[in-house]
Every structure is written in structure tokens, then in C-alpha cells.
Amino acid sequence: MDAATLTYDTLRFAEFEDFPETSEPVWILGRKYSIFTEKDEILSDVASRLWFTYRRNFPAIGGTGPTSDTGWGCMLRCGQMIFAQALVCRHLGRDWRWTQRKRQPDSYFSVLNAFLDRKDSYYSIHQIAQMGVGEGKSIGQWYGPNTVAQVLKKLAVFDTWSSLAVHIAMDNTVVMEEIRRLCRASLPCAGAAALSMESERHCNGLPAGAEVTNRPLAWRPLVLLIPLRLGLTDINEAYVETLKHCFMMPQSLGVIGGKPNSAHYFIGYVGEELIYLDPHTTQPAVELTDSCFIPDESFHCQHPPCRMGIGELDPSIAVGFFCKTEEDFNDWCQQVKKLSQLGGALPMFELVEQQPSHLACQDVLNLSLDSSDVERLERFFDSEDEDFEILSL
């Protein structure tokens, strides 16, 4: 059966390969586990990640566009997953765990609400597909890791509840000075704050925007996305150990990538295998109940996660990290510097204090949107307007 057309029921009851019996540790987004003594903890950690897959029968994108993303939306779903992990860390903490049929905090439903397949959800498939037009991608066209990262950065401006500083490190270079300036800056756009308040929807007893505040933060939580190419057609073996160490960092958000035209969200590794969540199954779109409750079981992977050999990974990836505080960022920088001391391993990217002279700095802090942009986004978020325009920011 084609993986792209699997149903959720098929997925739940199919045979899944269990973890190998090995003494090697299992690493999941900065957490270390033993397969012999902590198997339940591993599965609980995996099940607590938000799992976004293909969906069908959602409202048409653009009013007349696709009602399913089967066959083209896998990288968009992976982008949602890595960004959702950032929001979970931001609002719930890395140690939060989801349990079936157990009441969850209101902030959990606010996070989930931001990714529902509706055009007025901040990071919905509708928003990503429409905003991707500005990155040169037609609706229904397959994305690469860099494109989805750029789109999510633009959409995050309007999520004033989370107040994230999103930085995409280009040219394999992370500039610490740029990130500190970005994270110490106040909210970038008053129009975005107003738009956020207008687009709130009360679900699960809490507005989707939850307590939006204009109080400046000393450090806006950082989402750092680093698009990389780790080889020409196959991953260079010299990067493998460095890639593994990225999953060991407590700031890890994982990796988006996969195989050509088949994206996955990688959350860890065991031995020489990567552990990932697979978006290639089609589930019905989730609709809010009359009481605005979100049925959430299909957003959690309740079976052993998929695995693939590291050597099978396509070399085009994006690595993600989340630093809630400046101390988290400083700690991350120290860990990255230690990676350069790994014998026989190549660093995947360069960490520098200031922008190298040979790299042009283009609008690192230019996150604000002009008035015409805000007007287009207001139209985009207006649930009464079924014929809104495609955005190009």
C-alpha cells in the first residue's frame, strides 16, 4: 500500500518495528534513554511530540484551492512539527508529557490551535502554502527545508503570544552578535499585535492568542534554524558524528529533511539509525466541536517511531534549536565550540562572534511588515473572506 494513502486506522494497527535490543543510548531531542530500563519513557517522549501528517477534507486553500495536501505537503508538515516543538518548549517546557484521555493545560490547546488546518491559524497548512508563494513556490509545489524555514519565520511575526525571535542562519554560518541583537529587540510590529488580537478564537476555555502583552522581554525566546547541505548526493560520513551530537543538545528541536521529495521530522538517533516522525499518512482534517474542543489523539504518534540508517539521509536538511533564555543560548554556543574538537568529524556550520566581511548582512533585524503587508494579512486572517489573495511578502 502506498504510504501516502495510508489511513490513520491502518497506521495504528499496522506492524511497527520495535526499538533494537542494544546497550547504546537512545537520544530524543536532548534526552538520553536506555532501551532496557526506559522503554516506556522513550515511547512517552515520542508520543508527546506533535505529529502533523497529510490531511484531507480541510477548507480549500485560497477558497478554491486544494482540500488535501497528500503528495505535496510533507515538508510543510515537517516544518509544522519542528516549529510546534519550539512552541511546546516555549509554553509547556521540554519535560511536559501528553497522556491519552488526560486533561492537558490550556496552553497545550493554544499551541495545537496554532497548527489546525484553518486559514486563521498562525501556522496552518493554508498559511504556509499561501506565504510560500512569496518564496517562489506555487500552492501544491514541494518545498525544501530552507523554503519552509523562511515561511515560518515570516508567519511567526504575527504570533505575539509566543513572541519568538526566529533566526535562519545562512551560508553555514551562525553569527552570535546578530542573534543577541535580534533576541533583545522588542516586538517588531504593532500591526502584528493588533492583528493577533483580532484573530483570537476562544477554544478550550482559552483564547488562541492567550494573554498577549506588550511588555518588552529582556530576551525573546530564540528559534534557530540552520539550513545545510552535508554532501552532494549523499551525506558525507565526516558529518555523521556532528549530526548525532546535535540531537544530544538540550536545546535540540530536531532536523527536517529526509529522502528526495519525501520529508521526515528527525527527533533523535540510536546507534547508526535516525529516529523520525513520518507525515506520509492521510488522516481526516480535525474540526472543532461545538464547544470549541480540539480532538487531539490523531496529533500524537502512539506507536514506536520510524527509523532509517543515517547514510540514507538526503544531504539537504535544516537543523533546529530553541533557546528560551540568553543563558540557554550561551550554553548552546559553548557546546557547539566543543564539537570542533571531535576527532575525525567535520563541523556542519561555523559559529562566529561577528559577521564575516565576505558575507553580506541582509536585514537581520528587519522583521517588521509595512502597512500594505499588514492589510493583506488582515484580509488573510479574516474568516469571512473566502476569496482572499495569495500573499507575497
From Swiss-Prot:
Motif (LIR): 388-391
One cellular component (GO) term of this entry: cytoplasmic vesicle
This enzyme's EC code(s): 3.4.22.-
Active site: C74 (nucleophile), D278, H280
Modification note: Phosphorylation at Ser-383 and Ser-392 promotes autophagy by increasing protein delipidation activity without affecting proteolytic activation of ATG8 proteins. Phosphorylation at Ser-316 by ULK1 inhibits autophagy by decreasing both proteolytic activation and delipidation activities. Phosphorylation at Ser-316 is dephosphorylated by protein phosphatase 2A (PP2A). Phosphorylation at Ser-34 by AKT2 promotes its hydrolase activity, leading to increased proteolytic activation and delipidation of ATG8 family proteins.
GO BP term, example: protein transport
The keyword Protein transport is assigned to this record: yes
Domain of life where this protein originates: Eukaryota
Notes concerning its domains: The LIR motif (LC3-interacting region) is required for the interaction with ATG8 family proteins MAP1LC3A, MAP1LC3B, MAP1LC3C and GABARAPL1. Required for proteolytic activation and delipidation of ATG8 proteins.
Name by which UniProt lists this protein: Cysteine protease ATG4B
Organism listed in the record: Rattus norvegicus
